[in-house]
Amino acid sequence: MWNKNRLTQMLSIEYPIIQAGMAGSTTPKLVASVSNSGGLGTIGAGYFNTQQLEDEIDYVRQLTSNSFGVNVFVPSQQSYTSSQIENMNAWLKPYRRALHLEEPVVKITEEQQFKCHIDTTIKKQVPVCCFTFGIPSESIIKRLKEANIKLIGTATSVDEAIANEKAGMDAIVAQGSEAGGHRGSFLKPKNQLPMVGTISLVPQIVDVVSIPVIAAGGIMDGRGVLASIVLGAEGVQMGTAFLTSQDSNASELLRDAIINSKETDTVVTKAFSGKLARGINNRFIEEMSQYEGDIPDYPIQNELTSSIRKAAANIGDKELTHMWSGQSPRLATTHPANTIMSNIINQINQIMQYK
């Protein structure tokens, strides 16, 4: 059976399909629907405060008794100067003026937020905790393991996968360059951050680690799931496939943009957040590209552009807000999450029967 392996057993799920924990875009209905369909629904906790995360977990539990997870951002060392912030504020001034916005006060609460997310995950006994942007400290990993919480790390290179296994992760997401949203890279190479495609990355990671590997990036249907399994993955993580679902928190602006875009429309940019992320190209990205080397690191840039992005989205201006998407938008649908899950499973079973 294609759907029975170490990962499904470890996570107590029927099918090795994980809905990515997309911060700002998941809803209790989406998470529970995926879990009720036999996959692993994941709460995108990245931007939640403690109360919001507690409420989200409680709501998910009202909708499902099945396993689910929480995805959290691991804090990173920020590298920026006051002149970078001053320059960026000057460059962003025309956008703020056009949208009638004040210059924001930057508040960095990453460390405290992360600690609260971990405390809440343990307090609420969430079955699975997924990490992106790095690996948590040894003490945090120990606390989570003592609470019998399964840990899933993210890797965009073989070296990052090895580091995840060494740190004690129970499974690893191999995030290919096709993936939408933020890159999970955390080891800084000599030249540039890894941009290795899923079909290349997965088998190379599988060959050097002993824990289950989860393929991510460009996977939208049963064909992608089966291809990943053939490459040695024991599961897949899908983001964009569920982002356009009517159960997600995506705006109609974003949903329509993805549904109507093509595979050549996305780019990888730091313009919105200070961290590389894949999204649909627009005017803001193109105009900010001239400052690429001077953009402050995440979360500084994320704070500086936040009000611009929100205001633009509120008035339906897709040229000034982030439109995260993977490279397979032609395969996106607006079906409910349970329909997406059943379509994937049925397609896999049909292919297996045909073969």
Swiss-Prot record:
- Protein's UniProt name: Probable nitronate monooxygenase
Q: Is Flavoprotein one of the keywords UniProt gives this record? A: yes
Q: Which UniProt keywords apply?
A: Detoxification, Flavoprotein, FMN, Monooxygenase, Nucleotide-binding, Oxidoreductase
Per the similarity annotation, which family is this?
Belongs to the nitronate monooxygenase family. NMO class I subfamily.
Recorded E.C. number(s)? 1.13.12.-
Q: Which residues hold FMN?
A: N71, Q175, G180, G218, Q237, M238, G239, T240
Q: Name one GO molecular function term.
A: nucleotide binding
Q: Which organism is it from?
A: Staphylococcus aureus (strain MW2)
Q: Which InterPro entries does the UniProt record give?
A: Aldolase_TIM, NMO
What function does the entry list?
Answer: Nitronate monooxygenase that uses molecular oxygen to catalyze the oxidative denitrification of alkyl nitronates. Acts on propionate 3-nitronate (P3N), the presumed physiological substrate. Probably functions in the detoxification of P3N, a metabolic poison produced by plants and fungi as a defense mechanism.
Recorded catalytic reaction(s): these are:
3 propionate 3-nitronate + 3 O2 + H2O = 3 3-oxopropanoate + 2 nitrate + nitrite + H2O2 + 3 H(+)
Co-factor remark: Binds 1 FMN per subunit.
* Any further remark recorded for this protein: P3N is a potent irreversible inhibitor of the key enzyme succinate dehydrogenase in the Krebs cycle and electron transport chain. P3N has been shown to be a toxic metabolite to bacteria, plants, fungi, mammals or any organism that uses succinate dehydrogenase.
